[in-house]
Amino acid sequence: MQIQNIDHIVLTVANIEKTIEFYTRILGFQLVTFGDNRKALTFGNQKINLHQKGHEFEPKAKHPTAGSADLCFISATDIHNVLEELKQKNIEIIEGIVDRTGALGKIKSVYFRDPDQNLIEISNYLS
């Protein structure tokens, strides 16, 4: 077996509307409605399906929990501009700009939390 990439992930959230508002307003993701009024967020060629806590679609994670994710997104925007934009949008910065290692090499990152307290990392790969 040879796995090529991740098709989508699922976030279990306490409030789908708050999650949609955050990810579309703060990160510029697009809202997609599919199937039986299911909601997803897209960016580039990636997709995050949203499950409302207590009303998850089957099959689901064994213990679906809001706020347990730690996600790293690579931005085309310079990390210094990312940090400034987050501050302008009144997002509390947990840490940044810091050196980290991503899947393809060294990155510079900024950390903050979404409405469910998931840890969100926005990064740039170093040239």
What role is predicted for each listed range?
Residues M1-I6, T12-L31, G44-E95, R113-S127:
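Glyoxalase I/VOC metalloenzyme domain signal
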Residues G35, L104-I107:
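Short, small/polar residue-rich loop motifs at catalytic or cofactor-binding pockets
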Residues F57, G102-A103:
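Low-complexity, polar-biased intrinsically disordered regions enriched in Pro/Ser/Thr/Gly
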